[in-house]
From Swiss-Prot:
<comment type="subunit">
    <text>Homodimer. Part of the ribosomal stalk of the 50S ribosomal subunit. Forms a multimeric L10(L12)X complex, where L10 forms an elongated spine to which 2 to 4 L12 dimers bind in a sequential fashion. Binds GTP-bound translation factors.</text>
</comment>
<dbReference type="InterPro" id="IPR014719">
    <property type="entry name" value="Ribosomal_bL12_C/ClpS-like"/>
</dbReference>
<keyword id="KW-0687">Ribonucleoprotein</keyword>
<dbReference type="InterPro" id="IPR008932">
    <property type="entry name" value="Ribosomal_bL12_oligo"/>
</dbReference>
<comment type="function">
    <text>Forms part of the ribosomal stalk which helps the ribosome interact with GTP-bound translation factors. Is thus essential for accurate translation.</text>
</comment>
<keyword id="KW-0689">Ribosomal protein</keyword>
<dbReference type="InterPro" id="IPR013823">
    <property type="entry name" value="Ribosomal_bL12_C"/>
</dbReference>
<dbReference type="GO" id="GO:0003735">
    <property type="term" value="F:structural constituent of ribosome"/>
</dbReference>
<dbReference type="InterPro" id="IPR036235">
    <property type="entry name" value="Ribosomal_bL12_oligo_N_sf"/>
</dbReference>
<dbReference type="InterPro" id="IPR000206">
    <property type="entry name" value="Ribosomal_bL12"/>
</dbReference>
<dbReference type="GO" id="GO:0022625">
    <property type="term" value="C:cytosolic large ribosomal subunit"/>
</dbReference>
<dbReference type="Pfam" id="PF16320">
    <property type="entry name" value="Ribosomal_L12_N"/>
</dbReference>
<dbReference type="Pfam" id="PF00542">
    <property type="entry name" value="Ribosomal_L12"/>
</dbReference>
<protein>
    <recommendedName>
        <fullName>Large ribosomal subunit protein bL12</fullName>
    </recommendedName>
</protein>
<comment type="similarity">
    <text>Belongs to the bacterial ribosomal protein bL12 family.</text>
</comment>
<dbReference type="GO" id="GO:0006412">
    <property type="term" value="P:translation"/>
</dbReference>
<dbReference type="GO" id="GO:0003729">
    <property type="term" value="F:mRNA binding"/>
</dbReference>
Amino acid sequence: MAKYTNEELIEAFKEMTLVELTEFKNLFEETFDVTAAAPVAVAAAGAAGGEAAAEEEKDEFDVVLEDAGAKKIGVIKVVREVVSGLGLKEAKDLVESAPKAILEGASKDDAEAAKTKLEEAGAKVSLK
């Protein structure tokens, strides 16, 4: 059996139609007895864990931009600073699509620092 590199597989997937990809996904799930569940569903199931989950201190936080406020340009600049590798257009789109997660799975210190910077720029931010 030929061994394909990840790049070769991606190129093959690019040539497939959406219907073909869906059929492939279903066959993959059946063959390996797995499901392609969205990560959000896993996080929601974990949050529904009850009191045991509440007793544990969270070590990963999501920084959610609830509202950009009146000083949108300043918030866009801070978003570019907080989220590495983000261009001006991407940062603007992110700010305008609030409420939106800016950082996901950040450490407590990083999340608090990002929240402080964004709030100083005039944004309404929450940690989840």
